Design a protein with these regions (language model features):
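Non-catalytic accessory segments adjacent to catalytic cores
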Residues: 1-79, 83, 161-163
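Conserved hydrophobic core element of enzyme catalytic domains
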Residues: 202-217
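Phosphate/dinucleotide-binding and metal-coordinating scaffold of catalytic cores
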Residues: 54, 110-111, 192
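Short, well-ordered alpha-helical packing segments
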Residues: 52-55, 89-93, 153-156, 173, ...
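A short, flexible low-complexity segment enriched in Lys/Arg and Gly/Pro that occurs
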Residues: 34-45, 136-138, 143-145, 217
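Cytosolic ligand/metal-binding cores
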Residues: 2-22, 122-200
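An anion-binding catalytic pocket shared by soluble metabolic enzymes
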Residues: 71-162, 178
Length: 217
């Protein structure tokens, strides 16, 4: 990763499927309070300046096309530990929908908790799947169903959103062609609804003879 974070590999010693209701019954439900609600590490002004620099010097000069500029938000939770982490995990399971993977991982020195909408790549019995996602339509702020439909149609017709989705599909198709000996199949576009927003997405499918480690490389 560009920030220097080392890669971590999870080796599963036990895998088990349980009904969601049973899992929720087993998970704690502790109060979550903040010792410090914190804020963004980068101010709005500095972030806007960084975006402008990337547009002018990277995208504008042909050095890149699909770039994501990170912005970290830091806060401190009171009495943080296993029970609080599992409570956050529980709330994601209860309140988020449409996630590809809802996870809670403890590495020994940090927790990784989230609900990701996107599968980068999966391989099962030689079947490769990729899931390029783009576009974010927020469901908040629409008073009626008719208003939401009108805003969604305008969002889907926006050239910026259309080209951005094409761009991420093109990038992942290039990767698919490198690992799949027969090329890839493009399915979509689709809408991916979640609890508070809707994404646009494609599904890519292909077959590979490569070892999973080579696919990840």
């Amino acid at each position: 990763h560009q920030d220097g974070t080392p890669l971590s590999v999870i080796r599963a010693d036990l895998r088990r499927e349980v009904p969601l209701t049973e899992l929720l019954d087993a998970l704690p439900d502790e109060p979550i309070e903040f010792a410090d609600r914190g804020g963004f590490e980068t101010s709005d002004t500095d972030y806007a300046a960084l975006v402008r620099t990337v547009i002018d010097k990277e995208i504008g000069q042909g050095e890149g096309a699909n770039l994501v500029i990170g912005r970290k938000y830091r806060a401190t939770v009171s009495d943080w530990g296993h029970d609080r982490a599992l409570t956050v995990f529980r709330r994601l399971l209860e309140r988020e929908r449409g996630a590809y993977w809802t996870f809670c991982i403890f590495t020994g020195d940090r927790y990784l908790i989230g609900a990701s909408p996107e599968r980068h790549v999966s391989v099962e019995h030689g079947q490769v799947r990729m899931n390029p996602i783009s576009g974010t339509f927020r469901l908040a702020g629409t008073a009626t169903q008719a208003e939401r439909k009108q805003r969604l149609l305008e969002f889907l017709a926006d050239e910026k959103e259309i080209y951005e989705l094409f761009m991420v599909v093109d990038e992942e198709l290039k990767q698919m062609c490198e690992i799949c000996h027969e090329g890839g199949l493009v399915l979509g576009p689709y809408l991916k609804p979640m609890s508070h927003l809707v994404h646009t997405e494609y599904l890519l499918a292909g077959r590979t003879r490569e070892d999973i480690r080579q696919v990840l490389r």
